[in-house]
């Protein structure tokens, strides 16, 4: 009887464990949403890239600390290093620029900080003129002082979405949550639209458009309805592309940004408009990071009649020295920073070698979007 009871208890425990595991919420895959359709680029003869196996898109989220002039001096040194790599190895960057990082150039009371941030803008302009691309990035609503300045210069008429409601949310340290759930749809669109116009003005002198956005926190909502709201906001702000669909819970084992090569491009139907998604290539730590172990040769394996796009993600601010980090003891040592610089340059060497072997074709997001749209 005692043996039978133990057996019954064990069976009951297994049943409870099975029921519990089945009842856990499965992370939604945005690439499976009905309004998201995977896009596959067909190989075309007679193009500069026709003989290559894959496109290579190197992106970085430009979100430095800009609390003091010395912070700015440090990130400017990092930008100079990044620019030197690009020029030396002929591999351009696509910078997703956090517009709020440039705001002090226009709203800071500290004149030294203001002038220093003006210099960052000059650096980014020079890099854009040397073949780099600059697109929009935000982690929260656009700086309120900057937004008011921009509104006085050019008033936009923005839509308001009905049926806005709060709900359980998978991760709250993100642009989408802070802008949409914190302030509403109209403020979400306002940050996007004015942020887009701001970068077009200060980086491109209003001669080129900023077409793409990458959301801070890699977040586009808790479910398919949120994601559709998100893409509606991008469209209403005049943006035509996004880079950063993600699956799972931020920081958890199920966290994944983007998708595998050949599956990370998509079109998104938003009413009568069509948006383009160019997601990162998934990899260790959620996405392909140029300083973490990876095999670009394997990732670029030939897909018959298809030109896959490998999208890497880096954060140049990770090489920055800041007063705040020094004070709280979180600043990485000079040796650690130098080691990371060496890893980044080694990545550039590898890509250059694969380019010479006609495996990878380096490209910016702006150039890729032009190819996708047939321009």
Q: Where are the language model's segments positioned?
A:
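C-terminal motif of bacterial Sec signal peptides marking the signal peptidase cleavage site
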Residues: 20-21
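Metal-dependent polysaccharide deacetylase catalytic core of the NodB/CE4 family, i.e.
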Residues: 92, 96-224, 248-251, 311-316
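A short acidic (Asp/Glu
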Residues: 69-70, 97, 104-109, 145-149, ...
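Bacterial N-terminal signal peptides that target proteins for export
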Residues: 1-10
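Active-site and substrate-binding clefts of carbohydrate-active enzymes
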Residues: 269-290, 308-375
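Active-site-adjacent pocket scaffolds in enzyme catalytic domains
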Residues: 33-45, 158-160, 204-322
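Active-site beta->alpha N-cap acidic-glycine motif
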Residues: 30-130, 308-313, 319, 351-359
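Well-ordered, non-membrane alpha-helical segments in soluble/globular domains
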Residues: 71-82, 110-122, 185-195, 225-233, ...
């Amino acid at each position: 009887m005692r043996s039978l009871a133990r057996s019954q208890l064990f069976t009951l425990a297994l049943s409870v464990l099975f029921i519990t595991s089945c009842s856990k919420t499965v992370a939604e895959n945005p690439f499976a949403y009905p309004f998201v359709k995977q896009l596959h680029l067909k190989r075309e003869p007679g193009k500069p890239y026709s003989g290559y196996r894959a496109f290579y898109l190197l992106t970085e989220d430009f979100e430095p600390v800009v609390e003091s002039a010395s912070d700015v001096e440090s990130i400017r040194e990092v930008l100079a290093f990044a620019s030197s790599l690009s020029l030396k190895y002929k591999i351009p960057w696509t910078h997703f620029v956090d517009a709020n990082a440039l705001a002090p150039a226009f709203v800071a009371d500290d004149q030294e900080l203001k002038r220093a941030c003006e210099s960052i803008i000059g650096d980014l302009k020079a890099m854009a003129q040397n073949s780099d691309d600059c697109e929009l990035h935000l982690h929260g609503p656009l700086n309120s002082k900057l937004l008011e300045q921009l509104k006085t210069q050019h008033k936009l008429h923005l839509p308001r979405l009905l049926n806005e409601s709060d709900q359980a949310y998978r991760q709250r340290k993100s642009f989408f949550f802070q802008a949409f759930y914190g302030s509403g749809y109209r403020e979400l669109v306002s940050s996007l639209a004015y942020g887009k116009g701001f970068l077009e003005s200060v980086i491109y002198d209003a001669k080129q458009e900023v077409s793409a956005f990458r959301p801070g926190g890699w977040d586009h909502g808790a479910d398919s309805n949120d994601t559709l709201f998100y893409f509606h906001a991008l469209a209403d702000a005049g943006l035509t592309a996004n880079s950063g669909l993600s699956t799972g819970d931020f920081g958890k084992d199920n966290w994944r940004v983007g998708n595998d090569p050949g599956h990370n491009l998509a079109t998104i139907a938003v009413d009568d408009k069509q948006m383009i998604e160019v997601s990162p290539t998934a990899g260790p730590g959620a996405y392909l990071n140029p300083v973490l172990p990876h095999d670009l040769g394997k990732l670029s394996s030939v897909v018959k009649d298809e030109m896959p796009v490998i999208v890497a993600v880096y954060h140049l601010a990770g090489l920055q020295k800041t007063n705040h980090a020094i004070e709280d003891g979180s600043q990485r040592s000079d040796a650690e920073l130098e080691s990371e610089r060496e890893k980044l340059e080694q990545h550039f060497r590898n890509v250059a070698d694969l380019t010479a072997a006609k495996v990878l074709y380096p490209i910016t997001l702006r150039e890729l979007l032009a190819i996708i749209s047939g321009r």
